[in-house]
Amino acid sequence: MTADDYTAVRCGMNVTKAIIQGDIDAGIGLENVQMVELEEWLAAQGRPRDDVQMLRIDQLAELGCCCFCSILYIANDQFLAANPEKVHKFMRAVKRATDYVLAEPEKAYAEYVDFKPIMGTPVNRKIFERSYAYFSRDLKNVRRDWEKVTNYSKRLGILDAFFTPNYTNEYISWALDADSTDPTGDQKRMAELQKKVAANGGFQRLEVAVSA
């Protein structure tokens, strides 16, 4: 397929709406967000939820990692240099919140909805459940994932050949988990796990084998 075989349509994060309205035939989205929205829309129309399908970019590109749904905390060099303690405190706060979500997902979701009632819908509940497995326990940037995505972007011509990933784990003050010994296998197992969550609901995590 070349760029002459399709028409790109800019729709921002409104992929679900654009597909439902027929503005686009396919779009780029997240398995734990747009897929859920489309599945529930189909169910409301009396149609099977599996009428919507997703081709995972990480699987298509054989990246061996799922890194397109990462939340990044971005700061410029000047702020980092002038406020290292603030950054440390911010990361500790994020870690504390992450630990709480992983330990008490039901309570965490209830507090989330209490703070932002508009999110208290059946669809958003399912999105939260489908997002649970993706939470990073230690919040670290994984070098392998950054390198794979960077190289993939270079092959696509998005990045030039001299680009280097710009990230750091310097402001993480706790022990980091060891890297997975089978990231490609994890990718496949995560897909199967998410199918179970989609069918049965609840909060499930993937058990990952790590290097010693």
Predicted regions and their residues:
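Pocket-lining segment of extracytoplasmic ligand-binding domains
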Residues: G12-P117
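Short secondary-structure boundary/hinge segments and terminal tails
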Residues: E37, L60, R130-Y132, N169-L176
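Short, surface-exposed acidic
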Residues: T2-T7, P48-M54, K116-R130, L159-Y167
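Conserved C-terminal helix/tail region of periplasmic/extracytoplasmic solute-binding proteins
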Residues: N151-A212
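Bulky hydrophobic/aromatic packing residues
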Residues: T2-D4, N32, L38, A108-Y109, ...
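Hydrophobic transmembrane alpha-helix bundles
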Residues: A43-I57, R137-T164, G202-A209
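Secondary-structure end/capping motifs
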Residues: A81-A161
